[in-house]
Amino acid sequence: MQNPVFTSTPVTAASQDTSYNYGLAATDPSGGTVTFSLISAPAGATLTGNTINWAPTAAESRISNSFTAKATSSSGGSATQSWTVTPTGTVTVNWVNTDWTPSGAVQIPGPPIFVPSALVPQPDGSLELLSGTAASPGVYNIGQVPGGYYWLIQGTGPGSPLPPTGFWTNSSTFDLGRDSVGAQTGLLSAPEDTTFDFNLSGLDPSSTPGIVAFITDNPPFAPISFTPQPGVTTLSASAIVSSMFDWANVNTAFLVQYEPVSLSSLNNLVLGPELTLSNLALTSGTTNTISGTLAPSPQASVDLSIPGSKWASLFQNVAPGTVTPTGSWLSIAPEPYVIGVNAKPQLFAPPFGSHVYMVQPDSPSGLTYPGSACPSQPFFLPVAVDPPILADQNFGTLQYGDPFPSDWMRVLAFCQSVTTPFQVGSLTFPIALNYGMTVSPSSPSLAPLAGPVVDPTIDGSNLFTTTSVNSTVAKLNWSAPAGTSPYGYTVYVYQVIPRPSGFELLVAGNYSTAQTSMTLPPLTAGNTYLFVIITEVDGIANMQASPYRSQLPTGFATVMSAQVTISAGTAGPQLRGDPKELKRFLHPEGKRYRITAGHE
C-alpha cells in the first residue's frame, strides 16, 4: 500500500461574495483510484466530487481561512493537503455624525461626495489607492481590499488637493462619525449684516466689570460680548455682526454674565447670572431684539490642586531645542444637550466660535474666549492664558455658577503651552506646542494623562537632529510613554517652505496609528519636512475603528522633530489609482502657516 500524491496546487486567491473553486487532483502510485474529503474548511465551503466550492462572506474576508483536504486511495493509503486563503473584501465605512440638539440626538450622514478610500501597500513595494463608493447616506464601501493593514483615507470632494487624513488599520468596518454640539449651521449666499438690540436686566451689580455675552448653541457663531458699567443691573446695547452663517438656524442661546475671580496665579472669569433663550426666531440681515432678565445661577465648586512638577517633566526631550513654558489654561464648560459621551468639534467648523464656559481664563481683551479649550493641533495657542504652572500648587476651592441641566456633559480642561526655537536660514522663530487633558469636574485629578513619545527616530536617525534621508517612504519609530496607555498617535506632516522674511509650513498630511511605528505614504524628493507626533488618550476612542468617538478622560502630549530633507533625486514607490485622488498625496494643498520675522 502506498499513499496517494497530490498533483494539484491550491488556489489561494479569492474575493468576498465571489465563487471560489479548487479542483483537487491526486494519483495513487499503486494504480488505484483516489477519493477526496474535506477535513477542515470555513463554514459554507463544500466538496462536490473533487471540487471545493466556497463563496467567502464578509466575516470570512480579509482574514486567513484554513483548508485541509484528504485524499484516500482504493488500497487504503491517505495524504492530506493544507493551505490558507485570505480573500479580498469590502471595507465598510460609516460616516454618520451625532449632533446633540435641544430636540435630542440627530443622526447626520457625512457629505455624500466625501467618499473615503484605502491606500494599500503591495508586496512589490508599490501602493494602490482603492476608491470607495457611496452605498447609502453615510455608508461607503471600498471593495477588493486585501487582508492586513492599510491606510483608511478620509474623503474630501472629488479632485480635491487637500492633504490626506489617514488611519492605519486592518479593520473591515470603520466609523468616521463624531458627536458634536448643536444643529448644522446653514450658510447664506453672501455675507449679511445682522443687528442685535439687547435690553437686559438681572445683572450682578459687581464693582469689577466682567463680561456680558450672548452665546448660541451653534459653535460656528462667534459670541457677542459687552462690558457692563460697574454697579449696574441692566444693559442696553447694540451689535452688528457680518457673517455668512444663517442666524435662522439658531434655536437656543445663552445670556451670561462672567465675573472675575482670582486664585493665586489663576485669573478666572466665572459664570454668574444666566438666562437660556429657547425657540428663537432670528433673521439674518435685519434687526433682532433680545430682551430678558438674567437669574442667579446655582453654585458649584471645584477643588483645584495642580501637580505642576509632573507637567514640567513632560517638557523634557520633546523638540530639538530647549522649550520655554509660556502659559496655562483652565476652563470648565457644559456640552449642551450631550449625554454620556464627549463631543468633538463639528467637521469643517471654524476654529473659533461659541462655547459656553462656566470657568475660563480672564481675558484682557474684554471678550469671552471664542474657541475650543486646549487645542491639540500644533501651533495653536489659547488667546487668553495664565502663567505656566511648573510646581505643585493647591489653589483651593473655586466657586462658579452652573445653571444647566444636570444630565449635560461637563468638561474640565487644563493645558499648558511651550515654545521651542525653530531656525530657517539665519532667522529663528518660536513654535508653539500644547499639552493638555480633559476630565469631569466632579473628579478633577489634574495630573497629566498623556506623555510625549520617547526616543523618536526616522529611518533609524534621531528625530531631533537635522538630517537627510534617502527614501521617500520614511519610517518613524518611537517608544510608548509611561503612564496611561494611549489609544494612538497622530503624526502631522508639514513641508517647510522658506520665504524671504520667514517660512511657511504647508500641511502635507495627518496620519494616525495605534502602533509605535509608522511607515508614511510617499513624501516628495527634494522637500524638507517637519513632523509633529501627538500622543492621544481617550476613554473610548479606537484609532483602528472609531477614532472620533470620545469619552472622558482625554489627554494629549506633543513632540516636534528637527527638519528632515528627502534627498533630491530619490525615487519613490509606484502609486496606482485614480490620478485625481492621488493628487492629494503627490501635490497636497493643505492649510499654510506663514511665520515671518515681524510676527514672532
Model regions and ranges:
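Surface-exposed or secretory-pathway low-complexity segments enriched in glycine-proline
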Residues: 6-53, 81-87
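Extracellular acidic, Ser/Thr/Pro-rich low-complexity tracts
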Residues: 25-30, 73, 480-485
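Extracellular/luminal low-complexity segments enriched in Ser/Thr/Pro
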Residues: 51-62
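Conserved aromatic anchor
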Residues: 54, 468-485
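C-terminal edge beta-strand
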Residues: 77-89, 562-564
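Preference for solvent-exposed, low-hydrophobicity sequence contexts
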Residues: 92-403, 422-426, 431-437
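Beta-strand-rich modules
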Residues: 523-542
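Extracellular fibronectin type III
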Residues: 539-573
